Amino acid sequence: MELLHVLGNTWAAVAATALLPVYKLTDRDVVLIDTGYAKLDRAGLTSLIDANGWRLRAILCSHAHFDHTGNVRYLQQRYGAPAAISLIEAGISVNPDSYRANYVALTYGKSREIFLEECFTADRVIFPQDDHIDIDGARFGVLSLPGHSAGHIGFVTPDGAAYVGDCLIDQHEIDAAKLPTSMFIAKDLDSKAALRATDYPAYILAHKQIVTDRAELSALIDSNIAFI
């Protein structure tokens, strides 16, 4: 799994369909944001961690979709790393029946069949009023970005790089998609528009771009809003 430098101690692991931010607390201690697909990304993610001799200190989760939380429980068990996610998404993540809340078109039987790997129990819950979370003395900002899912959040690394999860997707993803994935359209539109008022040196889109130019970010926000 390739590792891209974003800025400072912030990196992004290139998973099968997403960028997974990695923040280096030290040369060996890291925080991972989102975990990719269970089947597609587990081997590569494990190899990346082990080959670099990293100690996984925490997992931060943007939301409970299978391409983001597919390896949380596995990483909790393998490395003893605590996982944090927003209150709403923590409840959704507990078991396949509750996970279905983010995939309402699926039957209960189908959700139990395909979502066993994606379910986990959060070690820390991020509440709606929380604007940060501290990991080993490093402060990560929390961005409230609901809409794509009910409790979707983003994170700002101590370097100031903003991970916006699925609040925005890149132009290639927009062009390739048949329909937008938005659970609450009005909130999603508000969250996308709210990013205009932010000013970070880098924005990491899970799917699948790093943006450092303000004009490019503005154009991408326009495209995402138009797509909805």
Where are the regions that the model predicts?
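Charged, glycine-enriched surface loops/patches
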Residues: I135, D222-I228
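Conserved beta-strand hairpin/beta-sheet module of binuclear metal-dependent hydrolase folds
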Residues: M1-N52, G154-G165
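Short Pro/Gly-enriched beta-strand edge/turn motifs at strand-loop
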Residues: E2-G8, K110-F115, I135-A138
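Short catalytic-loop micro-motif centered on adjacent basic/acidic residues
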Residues: V31-D34, A58-C61, V142-S144
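Active-site HxH/HxHxD metal-binding segment of metal-dependent hydrolases
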Residues: Y37, R42-A43, S47-H132
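Metallo-beta-lactamase
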Residues: Y37-A38, R139-P146, A150-L217, N224
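Residue-level marker for buried hydrophobic side chains located in beta-strands
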Residues: V31, L60, A83, A161-V164, ...
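Short Gly/Pro-enriched turn/cap motifs at secondary-structure boundaries
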Residues: A12-A13, D123-R124, S144-P146
